[in-house]
């Protein structure tokens, strides 16, 4: 019964303020509550501290069953909210919940969420829908008011600027890194499997995924998007905080593309943008911006960067070419005066620190050797401000810097100071910004005299500089020569010691000209990059006392010694022959891929290691050393060099300017094939050297094919014939030679060299029976000489006959 009376009384009472309702009003009808809200909204005097209807409040408190005699208005109930917790959707697909607290504004509540995520609240707006184009809510209202009128318990925080600056999402794909790459998080190599962003190329391990940045680097996408550049310009000019610095960094990196002159190009590309922090994951570092990049135009349309937002526009930034030229003349006069004073200061007491001090701008220190290419006479000294929001009034483009002011204050009374004072009014200055003025001490820019210790250090003679050595050059005191191994057409080979056993080849070069030395260094630069299993390792070169090269020592002997010198001569099996030819083709194909022509390929330069399974090619390259020139009629003519038995016909004729081609090495390889297959040198029946040169050069003479071993496969013989073709265009390259060698198939079983064993047996017996019975010959055979009696002789004859038939499978 009391419950019914409570409903009637509550329905009959006057509506109360939504700011101080009783918790028991939950059972009120919806129409009553909505009418309360509408009436309360229309009241201009609504206040969260004083109820609109105190009588109704007292009646509600009396209905609640509490005794409020004399204190009914002082004891207030907490307000009624439609939602106690509101879901807030933050930028970059983040979300959080905010509690509706009395008296807390929406700005304060949502700013806490944004600041925890390093998001600038001033760049954001709050809407009641996911669409950022809808009307934003008033952040000065309390969360109570917003919660009352919120259709759903959700709010959306939108920021066009933040999406522009850092909302480019990664396109992460799984990648196999061969060869391994360094992880951009921990800098350790990524072995095989890892992850990479297809947009910004950010690489990381799976274990480092939690430390990877959530968004891409803008430098990968901004150059392709003009609208994005304009938005970045707006951020850099109208906002403050970390987003402004990010926008300036990106625009500084893009300055050569957007509005910056070529002379103001930054020194180098930006470094790695990420570094690992054990407590906070990856932090993006700002780029090291050069003074030219930082003073470059932020907008492609205007010549000067826009100042930070202020109440008054910058009306003094005048794009006047005459003003720039006038300022340049002032700076030229200042530099001339400074050089004149330095020339008079011979004792060093008043040496200007302008040449010693590193050039810096806005706190970024550059090397002292680098000058401002736009205005090389300005030495930009930092103002020493600790406030990140403070700015200095300076002429556009950095024409008038603090060092110029410092020079005028430090050299008072001189021509320089008067010149500066006379022209200061002609320089355009930007209006003061909202930041407080900075106090600059004139003594900060004063030139310092040398101390006595510095004067003594300057007069002390410096030790002579050591001679500069080229890359991969080995000094004479770093290696030791043991004994001579052999000599060839281009030099003499010695065995020596250079951090291990090496081969030292002294080249037949006497007094090389500067051009020949330069060509030799270029070839050495190519040789030092060769790395292959079938190529001797190049270790360096020697300049003094004689030009020499140092290579890997081969613990074995050459193929020439194995075939023609050692006794007994080694006759390789056909499988070993093909394996040797394959390895030579592999090494030569690698050298030709590096544009290295051997010019002297022969069995003397093909080495077999001690294991007899690895082939090494040596004495390759060095065209400068292997070229001889003669003077004929005042003109230099190239002469053929090398060993004539392995020389290609076009090299012998020397009709072309450069007869050495990959096909000339293929011809030499064909002669090496002949040596291995025949165990003879070509043209061994001709003793006249000139006759060999003439006949081979004309195509009249080829190696004798009749001396090649008979078990040579036909496909290998055809390859040999193609390699020694007279026309070099008909010869294959080493890539094709290698494929044809791999296609050669040898029989697995070889023919027996012994006489065949023919078994005669009757057809009624199987072969297995004949074999089994033949094993019993030794036990059943009795020689005839053992017979003593006629009976034993007859028995022996019968046994011999049985053994005979047993041997031939007749029993």
From Swiss-Prot:
Cofactor binding: number and manner: Binds 2 Zn(2+) ions per subunit.
Catalysed reaction, written as an equation: L-seryl-[protein] + ATP = O-phospho-L-seryl-[protein] + ADP + H(+); L-threonyl-[protein] + ATP = O-phospho-L-threonyl-[protein] + ADP + H(+)
Region (Disordered): 1-78, 287-314, 384-412, 427-471
UniProt-annotated binding residues for Zn(2+) 2: 183, 186, 205, 208
Cofactor(s) essential for the protein: Zn(2+)
Gene Ontology BP annotations: MAPK cascade; meiotic cell cycle; oogenesis; response to stress
UniProt domain RBD: residue ranges: 84-160
Binding annotation for Zn(2+) 1: 170, 197, 200, 216
Annotated keywords: ATP-binding, Developmental protein, Differentiation, Kinase, Meiosis, Metal-binding, Nucleotide-binding, Oogenesis, Serine/threonine-protein kinase, Transferase, Zinc, Zinc-finger
GO function term, MF aspect, one: ATP binding
Pfam families, alphabetized: C1_1 (PF00130), PK_Tyr_Ser-Thr (PF07714), RBD (PF02196)
Active-site residues, as the UniProt record annotates them: 600
Described purpose of this protein according to its UniProt entry: Protein kinase that participates in the induction of vulva and has a role in fertility and viability. Acts downstream of the Ras protein let-60. Required for progression of developing oocytes through the pachytene stage. Positively regulates lifespan upstream of mek-2 and mpk-1.
Protein name: Raf homolog serine/threonine-protein kinase
Organism annotation: Caenorhabditis briggsae
Gene name of the encoded protein: lin-45
